[in-house]
Amino acid sequence: MAQTEPVDWRIQLSGDACPLSVELKESTGLPWGCVVRPFASPREGTQLPVVSEKEVERCGNCYAYPNHLCTFEYRRWRCAICGNRNRMPARYTRQGDRARLPEFAGECYELDMKPTADDEVSFGERPAYIAVVDGSGDGDFMELVRSALSAAVSALEPTDLFALVTVTEDIGLYDLRAAVPAVRQVAVPSSGGLSVPLEELLPLGEALVQVGRYAETIKAAIDSLLAPEEMAAMEAAAGEVAAQHADDEAGESQVKEIPAEATAKRRVGFGAAVSAVVDLLSTAPSGASYAPRILSFLSGLPNHGAGSLRPRTSNGADGRRQKSTPSLKPATPFYRNLGRLCAERGICADLYIISHKGTDLGSLRPLCTLSGGVLHLYEPVAKEGWASVPQDVFNALSRKRAMQGMLRLRTSEEFRTSKAFGHLTPDSQYENLYHVTACDEGSSFAFDLDFADASTFASEEGSGRGSDDEDRGSASGGLRTPRIQMAFCYCARLQASKPPGAAGVEWRASPLVKRLRVQTVEFDVAKTPVEMYAGMVPEVILKLLVVSLFTTTIIVI
């Protein structure tokens, strides 16, 4: 799970130093890569310096951004990444002034950029949260969901909007404006779309209610979420009381058994429900600008209607059907297409799976990864860990989020990034540029590193690179210094300060900011296997191994 505490680093190498050469790297058998947290919070009590993008001169060769590792000479500044000499702008000419400029003051700073018209249109203003709950779960599942939703509501601002949807073989949309929460339902067909869109059951503006104003109604609706057997037991108890009064003359009491349908095989049209919610969110009236986030809770495979999944089976040696090996390859494109639709409409979809049985992560995962959401899986082998669900939901909604991000890593010429892992989408036009739909302070992405043509960080005489070695710095005698620069462009809304009595204050849009975060770091060079092993960073190595294993299992989406 992502970290909850602010971290002070944004680029972490798999070791304290880079391997000297290809031969050394291969002899150790260690992975070589890095993990970046582009939106990580700075150390508590500090802020990143900000400078206007118009005031910063980029390298004319590799387009890297100026940083604290750059060197200066007469009328020129040298790029710390590629060593290129660049024209000295007037802003950089005075040495005393240079030291105070944000881009040279430390290893990390931000460029302030002007949001475009497209940014304003696609980035919603008012936070709106829609909970989609699998109503077919057992008592343990529903108890966890009630606790998780209570935690979610407590993490929201009083002016945020909230809606509640349940799904079994019917979709239930709650009217949270009533004194007693009412549910309006529509059946999920076995195939095709709903007979009645959710908008006709309850318009979007009425389904979404303000958290602070309707807190009691929201709490009552959450408390009403019961498992089928719990609801059947309550109905049976009520029927028993009625039967006792009706049969007083017979002198015997009749106990009403729980209906068979209450304990029958679960049916849940999850895919149809999320699709219907996405359609409902698309009916926002003119002038309303929402930043929607769907919080889904699932107790097992969605097995009814659009997006239904089945347990994966294969033919055994005896010809009988048996469960196949778990796979992360999608069995259907439904959730991938739905995730792309969410991304197009600025909707983030989170999914919490709390299941006693296996689930088809390969099919469900794209809904989250493509929309910028997160997927949490709580398996039966670790049932004691289920208690963390409410806290996990609270943490996820409490973190700051960046949207519409673009991420690039630039490296010095001896090495390069070879693979990227995480919720990243490669740009179709520019190499090594990745799109990040959404991320928070704890989101991390992994990159494999590899040597380029040089195959070593050693600087040999006669190579023609001696002068560059001096400009680029030296890890030790005769070695070139490895450097990485991260550039992360994102949009976010500034957190508005709360005046006294904020619970009753009407909502006001927070200003949209667009920033480009730049961090440049350099590393030592390890010359022996002993230095490589001594400097290992286990958590980074483990992440690189895990994501590499996943990549060999799933289809790239």
What are these regions (language model features)?
Residues M1-I557:
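Extended acidic, low-complexity intrinsically disordered regions
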